[in-house]
């Protein structure tokens, strides 16, 4: 069996890895040899099981376990702290119940509990702070994980210049082209409802020493998320996204707003903060419900629309695509990811 994969980013290489393990001949087609525009290379690398839909939780748990137990990629298990405001009570309560029912060790801390454990946080406007207790959540280096897939996958990679290619010799064609999946799909008369959503991440230094054991903090009240990195922090913000892929110029003008949110939530940490750099990257955003699109039409398969979860779910998605292509039962129920699904909104995209 021969499979062509269009898109050699994190999803494409995970799919190649899982197929090659099953004895499939794979050719990967990639337009960006240095992966300079690839979304995985511009990710903050976060991994969490705290999601709002069942299959997303299951895929996260599988993927975290895969990376920790099957690769030599270093994983920083500082945790993933999600902060909910007082008007987000129902979402917090429902998601905590769902996550625990799926085996996640999520605990919902009161503001006093949050303050006792993380004394650098302002908790005045919080309802709860949620974190898992088993040390499973955290982050890894995205480029290192991608390299691990490539180093452990014996397949041919062809670097192309955007021209249309003849895939008639392939038994299956897989589209894993991120935010470009829609335009790739059109070459095969397939409409894949995904669009590019550009986000900016800032490098920030502070006058005080970095809090090395800080978890990745996702402030769902302000939309800011951050984690320690080297001698500073990397900070993202869901309020500075734009729907285009014209360029990768950061949204420098949003820094003042980001700093205000940082100072509000971390008053003793970012009181003397300095923005030292920034970069931008694309989410491949599903226009259906912010959940992934994993489906096939005859011998064309596609996985995209992860809206920031591609790196995080890459082991599970690669496994799923390999099972679909080889006509095996899928480990995960992907009905929620099919094109004809009933939308089930994944909330708080960060």
Residue ranges of predicted features:
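N-terminal Rossmann-like FAD-binding beta1-loop-alpha1 element of flavoenzymes
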Residues: 2-27
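Glycine-rich FAD pyrophosphate-binding loop
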Residues: 20-40
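Central helical "cap/lid" subdomain
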Residues: 36, 170-215
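Dinucleotide-binding Rossmann-like beta1-alpha1 core, especially the glycine-rich loop
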Residues: 44-117, 223-225, 262
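Helix-loop-beta segment of a Rossmann-like dinucleotide-binding subdomain
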Residues: 73-82, 95-96, 102, 106-111, ...
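A conserved short coil-to-beta-strand element within the FAD-binding core of flavoproteins
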Residues: 154-167
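Active-site lid/adjacent beta-loop-alpha segment flanking the redox-cofactor pocket in flavoenzymes
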Residues: 206-299
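C-terminal catalytic lobe of FAD-dependent flavoproteins
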Residues: 264-350
């Amino acid at each position: 069996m021969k499979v062509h994969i269009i898109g050699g980013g994190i999803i494409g290489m995970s799919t190649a890895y899982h197929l090659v393990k099953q004895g499939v001949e794979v050719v990967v087609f990639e337009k960006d040899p240095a992966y300079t525009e690839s979304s995985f290379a511009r990710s903050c690398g976060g991994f969490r099981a705290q999601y709002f839909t069942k299959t997303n939780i299951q895929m996260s748990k599988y993927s975290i376990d895969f990376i920790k137990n099957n690769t030599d990629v270093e994983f920083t298990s500082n945790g993933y702290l999600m902060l909910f405001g007082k008007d987000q009570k129902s979402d917090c309560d429902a998601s905590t119940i769902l996550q625990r029912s799926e085996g996640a060790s999520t605990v919902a801390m009161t503001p006093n509990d949050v303050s006792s454990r993380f004394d650098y946080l302002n908790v005045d406007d919080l309802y709860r702070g949620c974190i898992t207790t088993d040390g499973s959540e955290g982050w890894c280096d995205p480029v290192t994980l991608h390299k691990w897939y490539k180093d452990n996958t014996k397949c041919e990679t062809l670097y192309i210049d955007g021209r249309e290619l003849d895939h008639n010799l392939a038994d299956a064609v897989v589209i894993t082209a991120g935010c470009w999946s829609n335009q790739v799909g059109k070459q095969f008369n397939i409409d894949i409802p995904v669009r590019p959503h550009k986000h900016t991440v800032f490098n920030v230094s502070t006058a005080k020493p970095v809090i090395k054991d800080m978890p990745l903090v996702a402030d769902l009240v302000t939309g800011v998320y951050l984690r320690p990195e080297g001698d500073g922090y990397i900070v993202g913000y869901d309020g500075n996204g734009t729907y285009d892929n014209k360029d990768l110029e950061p949204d420098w003008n949003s820094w003042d707003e980001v700093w205000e949110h940082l100072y509000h939530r971390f008053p003793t940490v970012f009181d003397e903060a300095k923005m030292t750099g920034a970069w931008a990257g694309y989410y491949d955003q599903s226009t259906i419900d912010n959940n992934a699109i994993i489906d096939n039409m005859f011998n064309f398969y596609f996985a995209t629309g992860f809206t920031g979860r591609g790196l995080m779910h890459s082991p599970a998605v690669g496994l799923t695509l390999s099972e679909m292509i080889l006509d095996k039962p899928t480990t995960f129920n992907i009905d929620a990811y099919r094109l004809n699904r009933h939308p089930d909104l994944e909330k708080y995209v960060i």
